[in-house]
Amino acid sequence: ESSLQLLPQSRVLFIGSCFADHVGQRLAACLPSNQVCINPHGTLYNPVSIRNVLATYLADDVVKPFSEAGFFQLDSDEWRHWDYATKYTASSRAALATMLREEWQLTADFVRRADALFITFSTDHVYCLREGEYRDACVANCHKQPMRLFREEVADWNTLCAQWTAFLSAYHRDYPKQKVIFTLSPYRYAKYGMHENALSKSRLLLLIDSLCRDFGSFVSYFPAYEIITDELRDYRFYASDMLHPSEQAIDYVWEQFTTWAFTPQLTAYARERSAILRDMQHRPINPNSEAHQQFLQRLTEKKRKFEAKWGSID
């Protein structure tokens, strides 16, 4: 049963794997653009990296917004950071630092006003640097660098549990009105073998279950993984690579999610807003026709009524 009740004014942060992107983008289509923030650090997959970046938003964190040791330079002379995904690239270390600091500040402002935090784990396999100033650090992304630079390992379950318990305790202290919702990505890690993929998902499920039990209504779990693997349970609902869920499967999960998390107010708001936005995207064959002018008048009236009821549609 959900402890989350999303309203038209709710502000939601999504962080984690590609599945967080998919669900986040669908929610963003239902709400004004400034009320949904999706993967501000880029796509993240493992619970170590996700916790590391979220910890920078705690009130007493002393490593804001990134570790200076995490910068590195590609052969192409571009600069990246091991705690951020590949979309953050700059021609100099200083330029990248400025970019990351600005993005972090925007996210920090959002976190302080957020109502819910969605976290999607994907795997407990992590990659740690073998050498350099950031040696032994778990990277958020390998940035297509040679695998000889990394040590692959399975994150220790007891350590994960202790770290996430400490983090959630601090997060609840700093943001007591927020809800935290975990999900598990249904992506299948064939590169580890299907047996190890199953074990990895099981360990993450046990971690999430332990956290949900310890934190009561503050932390909950939405069963996207089970919906696809147990309810749909058919390769028809996977993409052509047989690893990613298909658009049809994601749409089905989204329908279940709206039932689970949406209040009646948000359901009505999203339905009315979607209809108006769809009409606004209409491209007429003859813009000067009487029929189109009448259509525009009806659209203007729809927008007026919507904004009188709900506020700005943007």
Give the ranges of each region predicted by the language model.
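Extracellular glycan-modifying ectodomains
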Residues: 1-314
